Amino acid sequence: MKRITAIICLLLPLLSAFFASAADSPKREFRGAWLHVIGQTQYMNKTPEQQRNYICDQLDKLQEAGCNAVIFQIRPTADALYKSEIEPWSYWLTGKRGKAPEPIWDPLEFVVKESHMRGMELHAWLNPYRVTSSTKEVLPANHISNREPQRFVKFNGQIFFDPAYEENRQYIADIVADIVARYDIDAIHFDDYFYPYPAGAKKFDADGASYAKFGNGKNKGDWRRENVDKLIELVSATIKDIKPWVRFGISPFGIWRNKSTDPRGSESGGLQNYDDLYADVLLWAEKGWIDYLAPQLYWTLDLKVAPTRKLAYWWNDNVDPKCHLYIGYDVQRTMNNAIGNKPNELSTKVDLSRSLPNVKGNIWWHGYWVTGNYKGALDELASTHQAFLSLAPAYGDTSITPSKVTNVHAGSIDGHNVITWDYPEDYAGAVSPASTEEQEATDPVKFVVYEFFEGEEIDLSDPRAIIAVTPLNAVRVDSAEKGTVFIVTSIDRMNRESEPSQRMIVK
């Protein structure tokens, strides 16, 4: 008896943590993960078939961890992990810039399809200005930076598009337009690289010629910020002109300005977006140019120079509420740092995000640490913090809802019991992703299946009732007992949910 009591006592903290997290688990929460390719040699060392299998394995594990969105890098250094008529194939895909995969395939097309099959969003991640990532990289003679060198700057051994040139802004917008028009992505995502980061104590100083040409006597800092502002405004308009439902998200460095620089700033002492990268991210949110911000709070909770806890509160209080706010957390630092009687900071950070009224989710840096189960990160997310399925936050006018599904009924597929339903007439799966003129924001793109046991209250706000999010019109329910109730809803391109279907009761 004492032994049983001892075991129960040992389990109680774990059980209480699980049930506390379960009770707080929201139905709507952005749960993303970054999958970068820059610096990741595993892609170039695989055959196309192995690359596809690897991507599927990463997506499977992120799905297991409870993620509902993937931010996949497709343009790390003015190159492409997709079929492009504008830029060369990426070195990080094949080992040589401009070399196509053999046999040919399209990673972006593939990852969009596979993410959507798992009920996950796909955000196409581009670095806008970076051309090279190291001093060792040699660009071909016909590269645009060699053909029009005046449009580029060199700093710290790297090459960048000069943000001052209107031609560069239009070039980047054309890249975005091509991607948005041809691929069924959910968002365009830029990271934190705008004007180059300082190289140690040396700040960026390589734009003297363009300042002399375009500066018109303006304060240089203001002029640089204006150059980046123009790009963000142009990219935003470009996206919305093609597909209004495709979102534009930015993941900036985690500090806007320090309070020592600006009384509106945060209690921090690190590098600053506004002053060092010339990125006025709060302005972009206020102007409505971006749909979400995901500041990179990659530090430990109470690091003196950059305390994630205080910074999360600061972003919550200062980002315009019409712009969605997600927090980017570093998995490795989170799992390495014990806090109080907890072995890591994971539960505290998840709880922190959920406690802040304007924070609508998290993004994990990087996804490979999740899929690799770094110090149990995947296990803890899957079993506790993201144990129940969650829908990404809705955008736009939420009074508008998509068409509901009809004819929900029990059936059998390949000997398995299933719940199936009829697709709405405007189901997006019936429309080619390239046929932009036929697409609407209200097109249903996936379906949510709810399960309630006999006698259980029907509550569609309870995420514990969600058993599947799928673009298909059937789910397996082999173990459904008599009296179980199933309800299905549609989700449109803006993540808005339809009215519920009729109830299907297992006889």
Regions found by a protein language model. Name each.
Residues R28, W34-H36, Q40-N53, A124, ...:
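Active-site-adjacent "subsite" loops/lids of carbohydrate-active enzymes
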Residues A80-G95, R130-N156, D192-N216, S260-L271:
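Aromatic- and acidic-residue-enriched segments that line the glycan-binding/catalytic groove
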Residues E167-I175, A181-E267, L271-Q296, D302-L311, ...:
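Active-site neighborhood of glycoside hydrolase catalytic domains
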Residues G376-A441, N495-K507:
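Pro/Thr/Ser/Gly-rich low-complexity, intrinsically disordered linker/stalk tracts
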Residues Y278-L282, E286-K304, P321-T398:
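Substrate-binding cleft of secreted/luminal carbohydrate-active enzymes
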Residues N53-A80, R182-D186:
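Catalytic domains of carbohydrate-active enzymes, especially glycoside hydrolases
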Residues A65-E102:
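Aromatic-lined carbohydrate-binding/catalytic grooves of carbohydrate-active enzymes
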Residues V477-S498:
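Beta-strand-rich modules
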